[in-house]
Amino acid sequence: MALSAETESHIYRALRTASGAAAHLVALGFTIFVAVLARPGSSLFSWHPVLMSLAFSFLMTEALLVFSPESSLLHSLSRKGRARCHWVLQLLALLCALLGLGLVILHKEQLGKAHLVTRHGQAGLLAVLWAGLQCSGGVGLLYPKLLPRWPLAKLKLYHATSGLVGYLLGSASLLLGMCSLWFTASVTGAAWYLAVLCPVLTSLVIMNQVSNAYLYRKRIQP
């Protein structure tokens, strides 16, 4: 027997709620896992994976889930209030990423090694630069009077698209980091595959949220 449209809608909404809740838990759990693994403070380098996972796994994921209609932790706030919280979380993510990038460059300098020559390093640098541009673009949405010639709807569309690309870049840098000698020397077997699934899962949830809640809606409008 075929399901009614209303039943399908309820099932789909329940699945999105469950996936959003999973994204919250996975983003936090992955960041804690990396922190335990890296033991921040044990060396200069130890702060790099902690800060980068905090930036691209936890803070950035939470910044985007703020707008989720099913799994936002800030439902009680107005749209404007959630937008400001989103910008604050994104700014914190950028600061953590900049600090993490700076510390690993300093670490490489102290060892006399080349830096930003691996795919992980290059992806990380690109993700940090993209995050900086994204935060700058967010100012135009917080204060649209600064860009009077640009329709607000188009600004939101560009910001959403760019933000999704930036998030995927951050996730890619995390995935490449998990292929590094430092990570693979400590995490092997099933644990490694489970760790890899974390940014993959959160990326899928964020892609679904942005596409369905904004990009797809804009595409079907005349």
From Swiss-Prot:
Which residues are involved in binding heme b 1?
48, 120
Q: Give the note describing cofactor binding and stoichiometry.
A: Binds 2 heme b groups non-covalently.
What residues form the membrane-spanning segments? Answer: 18-38, 47-67, 86-106, 123-143, 163-183, 187-207
Residues binding heme b 2 are 86, 159
Q: Which residues form the Cytochrome b561 domain?
A: 14-217
SMART domains the record matches = B561
Q: How does it sit in the membrane?
A: Multi-pass membrane protein
Q: What is the top EC class of this enzyme, as a single word? A: translocase
InterPro entries for this protein: CYB561D1/2 (IPR045150), Cyt_b561/ferric_Rdtase_TM (IPR006593)
Q: Does the keyword Translocase apply?
A: yes
Name this polypeptide is given:
Transmembrane reductase CYB561D2
Which organism was this protein described from?
Answer: Homo sapiens (Human)
Q: Which gene encodes it?
A: CYB561D2
